[in-house]
Amino acid sequence: MTNIRKTHPLIKIINHSFIDLPTPSNISSWWNFGSLLGLCLIIQIMTGLFLSMHYTSDTTTAFSSVTHICRDVNYGWLIRYLHANGASMFFICLFLHVGRGMYYGSYTFMETWNIGVLLLFTIMATAFMGYVLPWGQMSFWGATVITNLLSAIPYIGTTLVEWIWGGFSVDKATLTRFFAFHFILPFIITALVIVHLLFLHETGSNNPTGLNSDADKIPFHPYYTIKDLLGVFILILSLMTLVLFFPDLLGDPDNYTPANPLNTPPHIKPEWYFLFAYAILRSIPNKLGGVLALILSILILALLPFLHTSKQRSLIFRPITQTLYWMLVANLLVLTWIGGQPVEHPFIIIGQLASISYFSIILILMPISGIIEDKLLKWSL
């Protein structure tokens, strides 16, 4: 009798993707984040679905409906905080996943990498629109400030902003369309994830050495299913600790005040996972320049395959670029800190220096160090 797992048209696809998938035998725990991101996406879609059953996308009732979810709906508080903190976990896993890709040279899989960059943009857009929905002070002013950036686009800017708003300010029409987009985008993300995996399985996974591992492959199940399960337990433990003990740790207290267009909060800032990009945006005095720098801070990832100058794929045997990589990580942490600070001395200059070094490390220093390391390797032989 033939095995249904290997013959059934549908089950066969799942089998080749998660069970009999040939996987390098030496991939470390840094390769766990793909499955953790899948889990985060499932958690977000499920909690979001239940929240949408009780939420109303109307400016007069949105804030009250969120309060109603927390107070009156069975385990509504749990669903709400799982969704809010689940987004933070999603971004932690995302940043680690992208960081792993940069360190081990996974960006040489061009199609997989570019779909990944597109996914990052889509997830960021989804998270931004989700932050607007509770209709607190930071929701309203965050939406106003960020959408207003589009007015920097020459000629069509103002028209574009009013078109997105559905009026002359952020109001009922804006909230309704943001809710519609926030609901549909996770399903588009799911489709993109499938394409991301499709391209990945065309080439097979990268590994810490960056070398071809065709000669040493093992089946994904049971080896990596068990390994991924450890990551799943750690993720769930971290998320539940956050939700049950510190649910508001990563949120903004201003968002517990209903949106008021007549009262501007003293410091308008986005969620913590956007602070690095927000710091880059603020570090440029010109509005259009700031917007371009903001977009480029993420889009720069798509340039990585073209900036790769070394003969080696991974950074595992490249000490100079390794040092630059960790400088970049530290730099991003500084940018995240600066993004949450008020626009005053010394934070302005620190933000500008950190922004310059962010682009310098990726665009100039890393490609140069790749060439230097190749030369050193040639001389040492």
UniProtKB/Swiss-Prot annotation:
Sites where the protein binds heme b b562: H83, H182
Sequence positions that bind heme b b566: H97, H196
Membrane topology per record: Multi-pass membrane protein
Chief location bin: mitochondrion
Transmembrane segments: 33-53, 77-98, 113-133, 178-198, 226-246, 288-308, 320-340, 347-367
Positions annotated to bind a ubiquinone: H201
Cellular component annotations (GO), alphabetically ordered: mitochondrial inner membrane; respiratory chain complex III
Keyword Lyase (UniProt): no
Keywords: Electron transport, Heme, Iron, Membrane, Metal-binding, Mitochondrion, Mitochondrion inner membrane, Respiratory chain, Transmembrane, Transmembrane helix, Transport, Ubiquinone
Note on cofactor: Binds 2 heme b groups non-covalently.
SUPFAM superfamilies per the UniProt record, alphabetical: a domain/subunit of cytochrome bc1 complex (Ubiquinol-cytochrome c reductase) (SSF81648), Transmembrane di-heme cytochromes (SSF81342)
Pfam short name (any one): Cytochrom_B_C
MF GO annotations: metal ion binding; ubiquinol-cytochrome-c reductase activity
CDD domains membership: cytochrome_b_C, Cytochrome_b_N
Cofactor: heme b
UniProt family annotation: Belongs to the cytochrome b family.
Additional notes on this entry: Heme 1 (or BL or b562) is low-potential and absorbs at about 562 nm, and heme 2 (or BH or b566) is high-potential and absorbs at about 566 nm.
Protein name in the entry: Cytochrome b
Record gene name: MT-CYB
